[in-house]
């Protein structure tokens, strides 16, 4: 990695987080909340990763654009991200879609979500803009990307993942030269172009962009005046710059934050039930791919005051126990057994129940003798006594949202419809 400058560029940057997406592939999990507000890792929300990256990178001016079912997200940020102080030249603004440009126009795309708040951005008076997606899980020091942007003289610098070439068909892919200068941006190509130094890999867009502020605002105004534009960074703004300006790729491996226990760059789009379940369950491994215990790069979130977790009963057939599991505060495991499971705060698991491969969101109550395998249980669900999930695929599919790989999403309306 390059050495950091004495005066970090991040101190003259604003992070603008796009957090208005629904995340429809998460199905009922986003019926009541936007995807960035979905719980992750036993304590945090997904958006906390982008926000923590900005804060840990030294960025002290942050704006978050919200739109779809934003109440849960806004409440979380008001509780957990209220420590910025204007007297220290810090600011944290929540920017809901509010028809600032037109009385009939909400945010129409990712670029429009920035354009409609141009006056607020200008008031910040920053030199650089870091545009972030609020729905990915990763650890990254944006200072390195800012440095590359300045050193290369680029109009836009795009954060990119190195992925196996034929796995890149679902991404926007960069066609680059030996200097990582982008000369083509291809959306979801059938035959992705390889990287010059790694022909079996492709550079896929992470949805992270760095601009000089003036250049970005000029580009947004030009795009807003184009009646054919869809007002989207990936579809409109970036292709225009690639064609008419200078775009440079920043490889995630250069700025990925890794502890001594993390060997590979970690980035996940937990946009499906399977991916969400897997990323949470991965945290129960002895040495997980994502180290959320790294104190040098903390994942900031709302620090809810809770009592410690408690395990009770020690009879041969009724023992509160957990193996290879993550159990958060205010959980009571009362004669239940857990294996390879992740529990958020306030979960109650009652006697003789068994959980394996379970991701349990806050304040769930699990009745006696329930047997739950490979499940995601939504916030506040009450699991009835004796419910069995994970043994009969056909029955599970009739009752719950079951994926092809066998993961069951369980919500309270699904439970209310059961005839048991």
From Swiss-Prot:
Protein's name in the database: Glucose-1-phosphate adenylyltransferase
Gene Ontology BP annotations: glycogen biosynthetic process
Oligomer and partners: Homotetramer.
Organism, scientific name: Rhizobium etli (strain ATCC 51251 / DSM 11541 / JCM 21823 / NBRC 15573 / CFN 42)
Enzyme class: transferase
Keyword Transferase set for record: yes
NCBIfam families in UniProt: glgC, PRK00725.1, PRK00844.1
Lineage of origin: Bacteria, Pseudomonadati, Pseudomonadota, Alphaproteobacteria, Hyphomicrobiales
UniProt family annotation: Belongs to the bacterial/plant glucose-1-phosphate adenylyltransferase family.
Pathway involvement of the protein, from the record: Glycan biosynthesis; glycogen biosynthesis
GN (gene name): glgC
Signal sequence range: none
Function recorded in the entry: Involved in the biosynthesis of ADP-glucose, a building block required for the elongation reactions to produce glycogen. Catalyzes the reaction between ATP and alpha-D-glucose 1-phosphate (G1P) to produce pyrophosphate and ADP-Glc.
